[in-house]
Amino acid sequence: MNENKASNRMWGGRFASGPDAIMEAINASIGFDRKLYAQDIRGSLAHAAMLAETGIISTEDEKKIAHGLNTILSEIEAGKFEFSTRLEDIHMNVEARLAELIGPAAGRLHTARSRNDQVAVDFRLWVKEELLRIDVALGGLIEAFLVRAEEHAATVMPGFTHLQTAQPVTFGHHLMAYVEMFGRDRTRVRDAVERLDESPLGAAALAGTSFPIDRHMTAKTLGFREPTRNSIDTVSDRDFALEFLSVSAICATHLSRLAEEIVIWSTSQFGFIRLSDAFSTGSSIMPQKKNPDAAELVRAKTGRINGHLIGLLTVMKGLPLAYSKDMQEDKEAVFDAAETLDLMLAAMTGMIGDMEVNAAAMKKAAGSGFSTATDLADWLVREAGLPFREAHHVTGRAVALAEERKCGLEKLALSDLQAIHPAITENIFSVLSVGNSVKSRTSFGGTAPAEVRRQVRYWKKRLKRDASLEKKG
């Protein structure tokens, strides 16, 4: 039998009895949305200031509210605030404490506001701040890549397709491929900030309010570009949270691909890199083991972030306008994805800066698998005037012969090559070394060391430009 506890709830006026204990448990979000305390208080301070400015509440009440809210902020940050599940969420917890501190004036704070627009502004502020943190972290990761790419602009390694040796490339060029990926991730982060940079405050429950509020004032106070333009849309959607998860999932996928390569490169079979003790662990039974656990966990945690994206998409897919309590499920997904991605970015930045490169092993592997076969075909087109399809066929025969002789293309005798095609001359051997192969790939974006260094210079300038944009913003 339920005790009548409805009257002391902020929404309990029309209820004759209080909720069941199970209802309280499933309804409460304070266990996770307490993370929004700073944003909630910030939004309330802006709302109270606007209410006073527009004459909706008195200046005296606004001062009491502001003092009380700042007191609550200090209590939470000092670990002295007692959160209550009975009060459901961060909004009600803060408001209840405010009433204890300043009395009836606290009841004026929620004028012209609903929890629907209140939570939307809290969450947007939090996501915006997290996106800006990710932006900085991505900048740091790119910087770590640039240092290593410049260092290894001429370090030859095998390039792969289908994880089979394809053509020689440089390690610097390979690393710069990830710079491009993470650069696009950073662009997506900034695009997401641009789209969510609208203030929901003032949309109220869904229809706006009859009070003469100034939504542009609160938007400016909270650092938003402008207020949202449709009050129903404002409280109905969480596409900014979905976009955050999408951006995070794409970035995590790039991190996972890199982590997979680090795992492969660090095996004794490849031996391309050696991870430091700082990012490795050992085995409880095999004394010789040095396991790339940090990279493996980066790879694994990508699935966690992808799961959060699919989960929230599924939550949102069938909701009618406007607000539904289903949307309470948005925050844990975003909070966990953000924490996970922050950790992944930090771990990867450390591994890239810390790894030891075995250039000799890379170069040796680059010469295997007939990796300069394309150079042979290109030489036949360029020097002998053959159509590329014919050159491709001739080169295939040369590869088959080398495979039969169990040697590299560069070890075949000139007479053997001329027996395949008479136009081949001794000059062919100049293009069959892996070093000359990478030097010849001078096309824009190619693997030639000079071109890799140009790519590095471009990205250094771009990082400086992006940093200056941050300061202007």
From Swiss-Prot:
What EC identifiers does the entry list? 4.3.2.1
Catalytic EC class: lyase
> Its catalytic activity?
2-(N(omega)-L-arginino)succinate = fumarate + L-arginine
A single Gene Ontology CC term: cytosol
Query: What are the GO BP annotations of this UniProt entry?
Result: arginine biosynthetic process via ornithine; L-arginine biosynthetic process
A GO molecular function assigned to this protein is: argininosuccinate lyase activity
Pathway terms, separated by semicolons: Amino-acid biosynthesis; L-arginine biosynthesis; L-arginine from L-ornithine and carbamoyl phosphate: step 3/3
Q: What is its main location?
A: cytoplasm
Looking up InterPro entries in the UniProt record yields: Arg_succ_lyase_C, Argininosuccinate_lyase, Fumarase/histidase_N, Fumarate_lyase_CS, Fumarate_lyase_fam, Fumarate_lyase_N, L-Aspartase-like
- Location(s), subcellular: Cytoplasm
* Annotated keywords: Amino-acid biosynthesis, Arginine biosynthesis, Cytoplasm, Lyase
Q: Name one Pfam family in it.
A: ASL_C2
Tell me the HAMAP family matching this sequence.
Answer: Arg_succ_lyase (MF_00006)
Similarity comment:
Belongs to the lyase 1 family. Argininosuccinate lyase subfamily.
Name the UniProt record assigns to this protein: Argininosuccinate lyase
Q: Organism source for this protein? A: Chelativorans sp. (strain BNC1)
